[in-house]
């Protein structure tokens, strides 16, 4: 059985989890995440709530991984990007009136 190396990453604002995993060829994204033990390191990661990707391209948990893949676990958004821009524009207009 051939062994491949992949990296599983999950980033929070103040800490990053980066785990190198040696796993059998033909394994899935889910297998690599389970092998990385990230689910036990932080309560923020869940198969049901987080999107998963390889090199910034969303994939399913059953996706077969290749040697050298970087499996990324994405955080959920805390604010809608449109709402953030709207608030940012509103604040910048308000500041212009003050100065």
Curated annotation (Swiss-Prot):
Signal peptide: none annotated. It comes from the Bacteria. Coiled coil: none annotated. InterPro entries: Mopterin_synth/thiamin_S_b, RnfH, RnfH_sf. Belongs to the UPF0125 (RnfH) family. NCBIfam families: PRK01777.1 (NF002490). PANTHER family: UPF0125 PROTEIN RATB. This is Protein RnfH. It comes from Buchnera aphidicola subsp. Acyrthosiphon pisum (strain Tuc7).
